[in-house]
Regions:
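A short, glycine/Asx- and small/polar-enriched loop/turn
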Residues: 127-131, 209, 442-443
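Flexible loop/N-cap segments at domain edges
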Residues: 200
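Rossmann-like S-adenosyl-L-methionine
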Residues: 2-13, 21, 220, 224-235, ...
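Extended interfacial segments that mediate partner engagement and assembly in macromolecular machines
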Residues: 62-74, 83-187, 222
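Terminal RNA-binding accessory module
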Residues: 1-74, 78, 358, 365
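Nucleotide donor/acceptor-binding cores
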Residues: 209-211, 307-308
Length: 453
């Protein structure tokens, strides 16, 4: 069939050739690509066209005529509706292979780099891994419920469990939902701006078993607040109950004010033997088991002997910095969020690590100032947001010429782009190691080390 003859709502047969970065299958009609969610490479499907653009279109899978050997039955009852996971229909081995392939292809396409990409480091059990949940509260069929948003929507799915959340946090969300309903608490309505409770958030410390519950409310006063807290304390094993007040009409979850309603205002966890105090706001990796794997890759890549000066750009609460400080002469960390820097300093003190310096500011401004002041890195670590490293920071790295750059990435595309700039500037990379931090989703983390040639 010619692509020019395709029409909206038309049913067509085609073979899926590949997966996109967001996990949709890709099939082609006369060279014209159609993106079809919930399909896998090698499958012959019948699909209904739902949208046609000039260069590509979208279709909805109707039937599978030939099933991939990698297809599995998703165990989650609401997988087809929920926007949280996108790869439950693909076997876990298939997911790991998909992520490795994504990294390898991205390195070639964007970075023009011929590097070794080993098999993705996955989990023995890829379920129940998340130590943090942020669950919106709303009315479904006239009842208060807490669940996740439907795909491309703010309609809440009524769900009893989430298979990628840890059991303790999952149970706490369900109990909290019951207790709020018992007292007639009114969920926040996005359209009217009325209601009392917006989100239930949990944080669980994997190594200590401590659990924090956060109630995000529209105002400080909430009907039956004391009774709700009392019931929560009696029915759940909690370390902390915190209230966040967010009175604004916004999609941002947290407001500016925090109030501890019961217990401590932090929970404590450990990574590689380093203790971390975690508040409701702290940035902290959500998969504790794989964080150990990811950071071990960074530690091994740094090859520290105790004589090195290390700079950690985008240091957050100091999680990588403090793991490296055990083996370095001195570690300097920079982060734009001041609260994170305060947390990093507190965590250094908690671990009695005196060979650290943390400063608030933009990495691309602070690190050049350090360089001018005579602070030069033997090893420079970057763990940037999805947009990758700032151009000015990359220029500073090329001027400073640290012996090694350890790059921890959450976006293969910007990793490949930045590696191209660094390799053009005299650095050499031999491999990029993918790490699966988020099973059942398309998100990929990767670690590489670039050596000055």
């Amino acid at each position: 069939m010619e692509a020019s003859l395709l029409k909206k709502n038309q049913s067509i047969e085609l073979t899926i050739e590949d997966l996109t970065h967001d996990g949709s299958g890709v099939g082609k009609i006369d060279g014209y690509p159609l993106f079809i969610p919930n399909t896998l490479p090698g499958e012959k499907v019948t699909a209904k066209i739902i949208k046609l653009n000039k260069n590509y279109g979208f279709a909805r899978m109707e039937t599978i005529e030939s099933v991939s050997a990698d297809r599995v039955e998703p165990p989650c009852a609401v997988y087809s509706k929920c926007g949280g996971c996108s790869l439950q229909h693909l076997s876990y081995d298939g997911q790991l292979a998909f992520k490795r392939n994504q990294v390898e292809e991205t390195m070639k396409r964007i970075g023009k780099l011929n590097v070794d990409v080993p098999e993705t480091l996955g989990m023995e059990n890829p379920w129940r891994y998340r130590n943090k949940s942020q669950v919106p509260v709303g009315f479904v069929n006239g009842k208060l419920t807490a669940g996740f948003y439907q795909k491309r929507s703010h309609a809440i799915i009524d769900m009893s469990t989430c298979l990628i959340h840890n059991e303790q946090g999952d149970f706490a969300v369900q109990k909290t939902r019951e207790i709020l309903a018992k007292y007639g608490t009114e969920p926040y309505d996005e359209k009217t701006g009325k209601g009392d409770i917006r989100h239930i958030m949990t944080r669980f410390a994997h190594t200590t078993g401590q659990l924090m519950l956060v109630l995000v409310t529209t105002k400080e006063r909430m009907p039956f607040k004391n009774e709700i807290v009392q019931d929560l304390v009696e029915q759940l094993e909690l370390t902390s109950i915190v209230q966040n007040i967010n009175p604004h009409k916004t999609n941002v979850i947290f407001g500016d004010r925090m109030k501890t309603l019961w217990g401590k205002d932090i929970i404590e966890d450990t990574i590689h033997g380093i203790r971390f105090a975690i508040s409701a706001r702290s940035f902290y990796q959500v998969n504790p088991l794989q964080t150990e794997v990811l950071y071990q890759q960074a530690i091994d890549a740094a090859e520290l002997t105790g004589e090195e000066t290390v700079i950690d750009a985008y240091c957050g609460i100091g999680s990588i910095s403090l793991c490296l400080a055990k083996k370095a002469k001195h570690v300097y960390g920079v982060e734009i969020v001041d609260q994170a820097i305060q947390d990093a300093r507190a965590n250094a003190e908690l671990n009695e690590l005196t060979n650290t310096t943390f400063e608030t500011g933009k990495a691309e401004e602070v690190i050049p100032a350090w360089y001018k002041a005579g602070i030069e890195a033997d090893v420079l670590v970057v763990d940037p947001p999805r947009k990758g490293c700032d151009e000015k920071l990359l220029e500073t790295i090329l001027a400073m010429k640290p012996k090694k750059v350890v790059y921890v990435s959450c976006n293969p595309g910007t990793l490949a782009r930045d590696m191209k700039i660094l390799t053009d500037g005299g650095y050499v990379a031999k491999k990029v190691q993918p790490v699966d931090m988020f099973p059942m989703t398309t998100h990929i983390e990767a670690v590489t080390v670039l050596h000055l040639n």
